Design a protein with these regions (language model features):
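Extracellular low-complexity Ser/Thr/Asn/Gly-rich intrinsically disordered segments
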Residues: 1-238
């Protein structure tokens, strides 16, 4: 008595065979064979919504919509190689019920990483399902170092951060800033806040005193939906 059985649900199912044995044309008493068929995880490939660098993605497969996810299913995975992404690591541990890691994009362009995941049913027989993939795009988050400049009164300073030398500057980066603070207070005019994204940081500044004065801008770099840590530009106005 042999056959290949498929359980299309996420719980244990039974199949009952009623068997009549025969020998030399003589039928014996029937008997039954009851087969318990444990479910095997079946999970479709996942394309995760893009995330910003330094944030986590989380995938917790659920039963339904073509997926078969038995109660207690756990996951192990390998990862594709991408030298521009840190924070991704393979996992062969048992008992992991979600796939989640915090990923960092060290470049200035979107990067992709692929997780190849093996699901195993936990509460229903430890049946190993076919692998599925999770594809995650990690968008870069701007990172700009603090800078200083010196100008003459009545002229403009301009700062246009570039990628490299510790900076991460995606091509779509724009900048906003709060009202700059001058030292001594009120010594410099021309500085104002920028509430909509600008491609450069530039303003014409006037030193109203007879002494050297400084003004500090606190700037937030933004690329798409990803905002970087604010940085400062300190301008000395002679």
């Amino acid at each position: 008595i042999s056959g290949t059985l498929v359980n299309p649900t996420n719980i244990v199912q039974t199949a009952t065979y009623t068997v009549t044995p025969r020998a030399n044309g003589c039928a014996g008493n029937t008997f039954t064979v009851v087969i318990s068929v444990n479910p095997k995880p079946v999970i479709a490939n996942v394309t995760h919504p893009a995330i910003c660098s330094e944030t986590a993605f989380t995938v917790t497969p659920t039963n339904g919509s073509g997926n078969i996810v038995p109660t207690g299913t756990t996951y192990a995975w390998t990862i594709s190689n991408n030298s521009n992404i840190t924070g991704a690591s393979a996992s062969s541990s048992t008992g992991i019920s979600t796939i989640s890691q915090t990923l960092n994009n060290t470049s200035n362009s979107p990067q992709t990483i692929v997780y190849t995941v093996t699901p195993t049913s936990g509460d229903t027989g430890n049946c190993v399902g076919n692998t599925f993939t999770i594809t995650v795009v990690v968008n870069p988050k701007p990172l700009v170092m603090a800078t200083t400049q010196t100008i003459c009164s009545g002229t403009a300073f301009t700062a246009t951060p570039t990628n490299g030398s510790g900076n991460i500057v995606p091509s779509t980066t724009t900048y906003t800033w709060t009202t700059p603070v001058s030292t001594p207070a009120g010594a410099i005019t021309g500085g104002s806040a920028q509430t909509t994204g600008a491609n450069t940081i530039s303003q014409t500044l006037t030193n109203t005193t007879t002494e050297v004065a400084t003004i500090e801008y606190t700037v937030t770099p933004i690329s798409g939906a990803c905002a970087g840590i604010p940085f400062t530009i300190t301008v000395t106005v002679n």
